[in-house]
Amino acid sequence: MKAITLLSSGLDSVAALAIAAESLEIEMAITFDYGQRAGQREMEYSEKVCEHFGIEQRIIKLDWLGEITHTSLVNRDEEVPSLSFEDIDENSPSMITEYSAKAVWVPNRNGVMLNIAGSFAESRGCDYIVVGFNGEEAGTFPDNSRDYIQAVDNAFSYSTQNGVKVLAPLAEMGKTEIVKKALEAEAPLEYSWSCYHGGEIPCGKCESCVRRARAFKNIGIKDPLLERLGI
């Protein structure tokens, strides 16, 4: 069975790739550049991840998506919310995380990316598109949910001749379990970039950084990325 993977270089997409690669032939990785704050880091780190797995990478620019996005993930004039461990619950969203999700929302981003990936998957005879959608974030990002995945699969049954499907190995997992599974699969987490910002080091305060930090704290090991960066 063959697959294409969506790779942002974030914790979830790197973990999903590593897990899927244990049982599937990964044809290529697609990375999107839509003007996101962390774009430079994501391109740099995703290239390292592809080298690790020995797979082809295709970088696709979506300038128009950045142009129509007014939230802080792209718009440098808007502030990215800062959170703490106390603000986040693995099992249910809070008012703070719902606010944070709205502050970084990109219009129909996952829908656009999946449909582009669907074209590549069909053209290459691939059965699956591997994604890092996960259970923890599904509460605040509905386009991470099982219902969304099923809806996309249904659409692909009409729009692709080979019935491409979305494969989300992390769909039922929280971040702590994701880290455990990623380490078991020997994922190159030292080259996974979760931060919404694109600095030399992760900010440690955005929602993505906080969720990641809490997961490593829960299992009692140092984040391989921070170790590599000497933090």
Curated annotation (Swiss-Prot):
Keyword Lyase recorded: no
- How many cofactors are bound and how? Binds 1 zinc ion per subunit.
- For the ligand (ATP), the binding residues are 7-17
Do the record's keywords include Zinc? yes
Its EC number(s): 6.3.4.20
Short name of one Pfam family:
QueC
Under catalytic activity, the entry for this protein gives: 7-carboxy-7-deazaguanine + NH4(+) + ATP = 7-cyano-7-deazaguanine + ADP + phosphate + H2O + H(+)
Key words, A-Z: ATP-binding, Ligase, Metal-binding, Nucleotide-binding, Zinc
Requisite cofactors: Zn(2+)
**Positions contributing to Zn(2+) binding:** 195, 203, 206, 209
Gene Ontology molecular function terms on file: ATP binding; ligase activity, forming carbon-nitrogen bonds; zinc ion binding
Q: In which pathway does it act?
A: Purine metabolism; 7-cyano-7-deazaguanine biosynthesis
User: Which protein family is named in the record?
Assistant: Belongs to the QueC family.
- Give the protein's function: Catalyzes the ATP-dependent conversion of 7-carboxy-7-deazaguanine (CDG) to 7-cyano-7-deazaguanine (preQ(0)).
Protein's name in the database: 7-cyano-7-deazaguanine synthase
- Source organism: Methanosarcina mazei (strain ATCC BAA-159 / DSM 3647 / Goe1 / Go1 / JCM 11833 / OCM 88)
What gene is behind this protein? queC
